[in-house]
């Protein structure tokens, strides 16, 4: 009996083998999601989207031009094969470098935002948000009137200088051969459409349309005076 008890005790004292439990399938998707989040752009994703859109447009235009190349299409395809053979190894090696650089800059932007959130006091943030709210609630009429006054002052200041340089340029062009003959044919049409343009500007100005104050008028009368003076000098 003693021997049997010793054998039983030895069997119980032997360490049990622990079989490793394979990771459940539910844990692997979380790792994949984390990897995907690490490879996503947070702030500069619009640059990636614009690059993809530009590449798609360029590829479409290139294929359209190649299809319409006619007899040159075969030569273009041969050049494509040569370029593909030379640049394929470089592309395989460096094709992800631009995205990694963009990802690096994106993470730096994220770090800057984190630092700002850390060091800027909450009162300053609150004041900034209140200032933004007040700015968005400013009456449109006040802003438009201010902009109108600025535009009017700029126009009154630079319009005489523009007229002077335009007159000087006109006199220089009149010295060119055949220019006066061509000008006499073109000027009536130009005056007609200039008058139509001025009528349109007056129309939108009388109805107080937004932006009408910024549209300049063509000084047809002053241009006519310059032409008459030049004609009198020529005679």
UniProtKB/Swiss-Prot annotation:
Instruction: Give residue spans, biased composition: Acidic residues.
Output: 1-12
Superkingdom of origin organism: Eukaryota
Q: Which GO terms describe its cellular component?
A: lipid droplet
According to its UniProt entry, one GO biological process term is:
positive regulation of response to water deprivation
Disordered: annotated segments: 1-32
InterPro entries in the record: REF
Q: Which family does it belong to?
A: Belongs to the REF/SRPP family.
What is the name listed in the Swiss-Prot or TrEMBL entry for this protein?
REF/SRPP-like protein At2g47780
This protein's species is: Arabidopsis thaliana
Question: What lineage does UniProt assign to this protein's organism?
Answer: Eukaryota, Viridiplantae, Streptophyta, Embryophyta, Tracheophyta
